[in-house]
Amino acid sequence: LVSSPFLNYLPAIKIMPHNRAEILATLREPYFNRTKAKYSSHQNTPYELQISQYPSIYKYDNVVVSAHPIDRMYLDYGAQIHRELFQNLLNKLLKNPMVKVKLPSSGRVNLLHFSKDNRYVIHLLYATPIQRGVAQVIDDLVPIYNTQVEIMVEEDVKKVYLIPENLELEFIKSNNKISLTVPEFTCHTAIVLEY
């Protein structure tokens, strides 16, 4: 999931998984919890050398369980390793996602299906908000180049184009997978796949 041990800023719950569960990450507990009675001059207490009997993360069937609140730690501390860990766990569950897009982390993807119109529409958004006082604002819109997109659809796609530019895109069909590249967009574009 990640290549080396790392610090989790919040405590873990002690969970004992089913014996058929796959252990994805082990846990090393701190020597002690920092309190007024037990103080360490470092921000974090060093961890014990032996691995805990309680795992940090495990997978059982189609469920992944984490002993640490990964989402809250990322929200509170913004550590990239927590975001990567979450993404890797999600990838373990989503073996064949319907849409894959290579965008920077601030990118957003939205897929719509208009069955009456025989088309799919993929919206791509990218902007980097920055903190200005209490508000997050978008000062600069940066163009994004050569965005790779894959979508799994059962329908026989005939035409792919960007709107509102009405720029037709080349695409590759392989079984149910459509692969294409959006040459450039700034802030937003929409890809239409007609079948």
What are these regions (language model features)?
Residues 1-195:
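A conserved amphipathic helix/loop scaffold
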